[in-house]
């Protein structure tokens, strides 16, 4: 996704005039050195932009106000180089609506034991300047992140980079438009929800477009464009005999390409970066979009089936969060179980729509097979197995008075047998801490059957996401025990009830 050049993060130094112009000159020099080094050596995902020193209430307020109105600014990293009285920050922080991180660092790593004097002490006061700043954040009940460590420390770099991804994701989410082609799958509860509340909370908008509008665009795609895209299919995928030239399902592949081009044109023209479909609302389309959806997800679009706009939005958000990281992120569904003593497994898939970003390295297979649901022509799809290793599945649900994010840590494993009659992409995993505990906890917490599956992101990423958006998070991992989990659900009811 071309998102790296769209955003930057501002680096703000807090100080005061108490120490005189020479100290402020040194503070500025240190700040310039640190920012230049971080931009060139720390492998941060986004550029740090140094702003003028914040030494008075008016200066700080101006920086925060400017940050709010600059669409390129994804958030603020604040370094309290000297002591910076926190009352100076109140007006600015009151109006700030961008993510905030305090980098609790100092210019020197080691103390100069033989030469340290009070001038050095006054210049390098992060140790208590950061605490003063932390107090005002706590007093104002303002959520902000804190990273402690020397500015040359790789772990600090990684944590700042992770926070940057969250900040950019939040900014991107404020501009996110979700298109629903048709409505929800009829009578399904968890895919429904309050779209107005979601826009107030997260910033993304959700609107429905009749499938007929999409069909008009699909039908306008030229044969030349279709053939060019099919040539791309030929080079990227292993085509089954039925899908090759003169194959009995070749026309289905051509139609899938036409749908993909039409969908992408519709989404681009509308400024949409997430969308849903439903097999119950396909009037005018010749097949359920399988291959088109898979390829659009791989390009960074959020998607979910059956009108599930919350999961579609979450997928787009998590794709932005994971931009540039190794591993993929996909729409997923817990489909069926393998019960075996000590080796319980979950087979995840969907009817067609699993993102190739999570596939093993070899070329996916492009095939056309019968689909009994939807009542349309046989759809094209990519078939592949998934990479192994640690992963997460996440679900965002609407509880009426709040949103709850559920995260289950999992371990993806290799499929022990071939699946010759299962013509869909799939993932096989062990749920942590075990399948009975994980499934019971998930069900008790109201988790959806649709999830976002990710090898690229981890539990810490999702904790940051929940904190930044001020929503509840419920975690199921190797530390989960059902009695304590149930207690936590009850305590959360009380806590969030008091906050209403």
Swiss-Prot record:
Pfam annotation, one family: AraA_N
Catalyses which reaction(s): beta-L-arabinopyranose = L-ribulose
Query: What is its EC class?
Result: isomerase
GO cellular component, alphabetical, reads: cytosol
Functional pathway: Carbohydrate degradation; L-arabinose degradation via L-ribulose; D-xylulose 5-phosphate from L-arabinose (bacterial route): step 1/3
List UniProt keywords, sorted A-Z. Arabinose catabolism, Carbohydrate metabolism, Isomerase, Manganese, Metal-binding
Q: What does this protein do?
A: Catalyzes the conversion of L-arabinose to L-ribulose.
Which PANTHER family does the record cross-reference, listed alphabetically? L-ARABINOSE ISOMERASE (PTHR38464:SF1)
**Could you say which protein family the record assigns here?**
Belongs to the arabinose isomerase family.
Task: Please state what the protein is called.
Answer: L-arabinose isomerase
User: Which species is the source of this protein?
Assistant: Shigella flexneri
């Amino acid at each position: 996704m071309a998102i790296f050049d769209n955003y930057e993060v501002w680096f703000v130094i807090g100080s005061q005039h108490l120490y005189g112009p020479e100290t402020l000159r040194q503070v500025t020099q240190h700040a310039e050195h640190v920012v230049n080094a971080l931009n060139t050596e720390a492998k941060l995902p986004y550029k740090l932009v140094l702003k003028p020193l914040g030494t008075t209430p008016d200066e700080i307020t101006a920086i925060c106000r400017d940050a709010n109105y600059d669409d390129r600014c994804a958030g603020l990293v604040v370094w309290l180089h000297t002591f910076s009285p926190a009352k100076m920050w109140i007006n600015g922080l009151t109006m700030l609506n961008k993510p905030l991180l305090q980098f609790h660092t100092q210019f020197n790593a080691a103390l100069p034991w033989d030469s340290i004097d009070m001038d050095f002490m006054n210049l390098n006061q992060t140790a208590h300047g950061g605490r003063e700043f932390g107090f005002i954040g706590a007093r104002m009940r303002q959520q902000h992140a804190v990273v402690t460590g020397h500015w040359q420390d790789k772990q600090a770099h990684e944590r700042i980079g992770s926070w940057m991804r969250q900040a950019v994701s939040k900014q991107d989410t404020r501009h996110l438009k979700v298109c629903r082609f048709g409505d929800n799958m009829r009578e399904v509860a968890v895919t429904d929800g309050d779209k107005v509340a979601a826009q107030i909370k997260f910033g993304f908008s959700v609107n429905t477009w009749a499938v007929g509008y999409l069909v008009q665009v699909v039908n306008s795609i030229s044969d030349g464009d279709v053939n060019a895209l099919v040539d791309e299919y030929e080079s990227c995928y292993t085509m089954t005999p039925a899908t090759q030239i003169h194959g009995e399902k070749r026309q289905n592949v051509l139609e899938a390409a036409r749908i993909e081009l039409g969908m992408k044109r519709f989404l681009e023209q509308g400024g949409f970066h997430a969308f849903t479909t439903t097999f119950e609302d396909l009037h005018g389309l010749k097949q359920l979009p399988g291959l088109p959806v898979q390829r659009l997800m791989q390009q960074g679009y959020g998607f979910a089936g059956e009108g599930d706009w919350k999961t579609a939005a979450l997928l787009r958000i998590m794709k932005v969060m994971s931009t540039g990281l190794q591993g993929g992120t996909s729409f997923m569904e817990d489909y069926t179980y393998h019960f075996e003593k000590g080796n319980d497994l979950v087979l995840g898939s969907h009817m067609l729509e699993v993102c190739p970003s999570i596939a093993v390295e070899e070329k996916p297979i492009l095939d056309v097979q019968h689909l009994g649901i939807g009542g349309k022509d046989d759809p094209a799809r990519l078939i592949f197995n998934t990479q192994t290793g640690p992963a997460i599945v996440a679900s965002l649900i609407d509880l009426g008075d709040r949103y709850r994010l559920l995260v289950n840590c999992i371990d993806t494993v290799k499929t022990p047998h071939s699946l010759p009659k299962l013509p869909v992409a799939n993932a096989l995993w062990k749920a942590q801490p075990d399948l009975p505990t994980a499934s019971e906890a998930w069900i008790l917490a109201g988790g959806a059957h649709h999830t976002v599956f990710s090898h690229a992101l981890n539990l810490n990423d999702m904790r940051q996401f929940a904190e930044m958006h001020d929503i509840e998070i419920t975690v199921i991992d190797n530390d989960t025990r059902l009695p304590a989990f149930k207690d936590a659900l009850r305590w959360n009811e009380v806590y969030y009830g008091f906050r209403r």
